[in-house]
Amino acid sequence: MKQALRVAFGFLILWASVLHAEVRIVIDSGVDSGRPIGVVPFQWVGPGAAPEDIGGIVAADLRNSGKFNPLDRARLPQQPGSAQEVQPAAWSALGIDAVVVGQVTPNPDGSYNVAYQLVDTGGAPGTVLAQNSYKVNKQWLRYAGHTASDEVFEKLTGIKGAFRTRIAYVVQTNGGQFPYELRVSDYDGYNQFVVHRSPQPLMSPAWSPDGSKLAYVTFESGRSALVIQTLANGAVRQVASFPRHNGAPAFSPDGSKLAFALSKTGSLNLYVMDLASGQIRQVTDGRSNNTEPTWFPDSQNLAFTSDQAGRPQVYKVNINGGAPQRITWEGSQNQDADVSSDGKFMVMVSSNGGQQHIAKQDLATGGVQVLSSTFLDETPSLAPNGTMVIYSSSQGMGSVLNLVSTDGRFKARLPATDGQVKFPAWSPYL
């Protein structure tokens, strides 16, 4: 069925400065453990060369998920342009039970039709398992590829795809008038642009649940301040600029509240603002430091970091009252948690034996699995479907972004070429 591809990224507009030194995914390990799949180069039905390698985008997305291992193009037994041309036996002989084929066709008005078919080459040979077609302008061809990837991924795994999502992060460059930049890119590092430039540090970007805004910390006024920036027009709303520390913003899943940490009374404590009224209420109290809030799906409970037991550990508290409950017990310290959208697990920075890695904790059983193997890992952020984590780690004298699957098998890097990259935040579905 043909459908016009909806333009979900309304903030890709003229004020956004597109960058050339983009991050790119470099896979370190885990692809071989994925399910084999065939992704054929999409047939270009037009003159000259195709404007975009859609098949390559789909193959890269499926590979980057850690759940699939696309067959190398040099090993493809055939290159069919449609489902009818697929020879199932040729693929099943290589252990492949599903193949993606597609076509890209130019239209007289300058747009393109992008179509794909997912073909069964195993249990029901030749059956079309999923198919779709999108009409898009040239600048949306990559998005069309990610859309096809999302649909193929969901059909084969039962999990909603997250290939149309984005990541926000802070880049610190050397020198210049504005050495700190808040940037946004596609999840795979493409289409990067600057949201805000500053002569002073920027920290802790957090997405609104509809993907239209970013909250972050800025020091441009001479002290820390929390602001919310609307991506479509660049409008900035100041949320908090109290004496001492203002930090760690986190939007509630229902979009009505913003949690953050303030030290205006001396100790660092959690506060929640009602975004409609601007009213702020204090959630935690005491002499301990309480920070790094992350919401549970009900928008009523927070996980957060506290040193009330001596070393940092993760606790849970209801924003309407009640004593915080400690929820991490393994490792010498645990902090900076991010709760999954279904509330079943969280990822966090876990330290033990002098090592600081990203770990996953089952919130029902308390079981902990260390996911990463990089150095001085920080600030984990979950993909909205809970399958991947992006985080920063130290490499040489700098900081880079890394990806790891939540089963720990797939690992990749997103090395930048023009600065240190910190504070990654994965967007919601867009």
From Swiss-Prot:
The keyword Signal applies. Keywords: Cell cycle, Cell division, Periplasm, Signal. It comes from the Bacteria. Transmembrane segments: none annotated. GO terms for cellular component: periplasmic space. It is found in: Periplasm. Pfam families: PD40 (PF07676), TolB_N (PF04052). HAMAP family: TolB (MF_00671). The Tol-Pal system is composed of five core proteins: the inner membrane proteins TolA, TolQ and TolR, the periplasmic protein TolB and the outer membrane protein Pal. They form a network linking the inner and outer membranes and the peptidoglycan layer. Belongs to the TolB family. NCBIfam families: propeller_TolB. This is Tol-Pal system protein TolB. The lineage of its organism: Bacteria, Pseudomonadati, Pseudomonadota, Gammaproteobacteria, Enterobacterales.
